[in-house]
Curated annotation (Swiss-Prot):
Keywords: Cell cycle, Cell division, Cell membrane, Cell shape, Cell wall biogenesis/degradation, Glycosyltransferase, Membrane, Peptidoglycan synthesis, Transferase. It is an enzyme of class 2 (transferase). InterPro entries: GlcNAc_MurG, Glyco_trans_28_C, GlycoTrans_28_N. Belongs to the glycosyltransferase 28 family. MurG subfamily. This is UDP-N-acetylglucosamine--N-acetylmuramyl-(pentapeptide) pyrophosphoryl-undecaprenol N-acetylglucosamine transferase. Its main location: membrane.
């Protein structure tokens, strides 16, 4: 049996694309193992799927000054030795890396063991982890056509992003039932990313009366961000994080407010959900979400509201405009030729399996 080790972590965006590949890889006869960080969000997600998980040490990679920048390289080095030992023992035929700081030691260790590595970059420009890992990769899959020029060497392959099959098979009635909505108001789904978004949470709750006058709200607010004072608010349902329920909640929603991570916006495109994107500002990111959002806005798939312009009036104005013009966005998304990347990526994995 062929064996693959997958890696990726830090946020759900570095894990869920791996899960999208799992059913197809199993169908192709691959035994699947996973290397991730000790305490990252990926551990719970992967172990829930029944996949054997190997934790390693991993230091965070930063583009800014921090005292931990002096100690974290040693954690990365430790992670390389741990990953090298795991890879030598498990003898995988190939490694698939989805990015995030934990992947750097795994990719280096695979290279040292002469194991081919396929990486995937979701955003238009590569994150720091993938930048560091690219020299050790066999091929780098990219989601956006604009990304090819940002990958050094002749390694980039335009594959699209892998989307979980089950996400496309949600049940609208089950989603509505889960939320307990009784009227026929349109449903607004708010997603702040797997770690939540304080900025989005605060402005939504501040404008709750205005929004609830037109919409029922499903609010995925992130771990430890529930507001107990709103538990019994009619038309408002909040979740820290959802997994199995997400397809039903997506299917039930009419509009979506979201950050602009590449994975989630391609899921919204696949589901043809009119969306308002609020990308992370450059103050708190490298600007990748701004580029992602601009690309989708240019294609007519999304309406964008910059975080710096996020105010009560601008939020309501954009939300009302999106709802009034929702069919325009649905039609634009229906014309998209972007493939689900699962088939393209698994074909590449097959090609380079030792």
């Amino acid at each position: 049996m062929k064996k693959i080790i997958m890696t990726g972590g830090g946020t759900a965006g570095h894990v869920t694309p791996n899960l999208a590949l799992v059913p197809e890889l199993k169908k192709l006869g691959y035994e699947i193992k996973y290397i991730g960080s000790i305490e990252g969000i990926e551990r719970k997600i992967i172990e829930r799927e029944g996949i054997e998980y190997f934790p390693i040490s991993s230091g965070k990679l930063r583009r800014y000054f921090d005292l931990k920048n002096f100690s974290d390289p040693f954690k990365v080095l430790k992670g390389v030795f741990q990953a090298k030992k795991i890879i030598k023992r498990e003898k995988p035929d190939i490694v698939f890396s989805k990015g995030g700081f934990v992947t750097v030691p795994v990719v280096i260790a695979a290279h040292l063991n002469k194991i081919p590595v396929i990486a995937h970059e979701s955003d238009i420009t590569p994150g720091l982890a993938n930048k560091l890992a690219t020299p050790y990769c066999t091929r780098v899959c990219v989601t956006f056509p604009e990304s090819v020029k940002h990958i050094k060497g002749d390694k980039a392959v335009l594959t699209g992003t892998p989307i979980r099959r089950e996400l496309l098979e949600g049940n609208k009635l089950e989603g509505i039932k889960l939320c307990g909505f009784k009227d026929n108001k349109p449903i607004l789904l708010i997603i702040g990313g797997s770690l939540g978004s304080k900025v989005i949470n605060e402005i939504v709750r501040k404008n709750l009366d205005n929004i609830l006058s037109k919409f029922n709200i499903i609010h995925i607010c992130g771990k430890s961000n529930l507001d107990e004072n709103l538990e019994n608010r009619k038309g408002y349902v909040q979740f820290e994080y959802v997994n199995e329920e997400l397809p039903d909640l997506m299917k039930a929603s009419d509009l979506v407010i979201s950050r602009a991570g590449a994975n989630v916006i391609y899921e919204l495109l696949a589901l043809k959900k009119p969306n308002l994107l609020i990308p992370l500002s450059k103050k708190s990111s490298r600007g990748d979400q701004i580029l992602n959002a601009a690309s989708f806005e240019k294609s007519g798939y999304s309406l964008v509201l910059k975080e710096e312009e996020l105010e009560d009036k601008t939020l309501m104005k954009k939300l009302n405009y999106l709802y009034e013009n929702r069919n325009v966005y649905i039609n634009n998304m229906s014309k998209s030729k972007m493939d689900n990347g699962v088939k393209n990526i698994t074909e590449l994995i097959k090609k380079y399996t030792k």
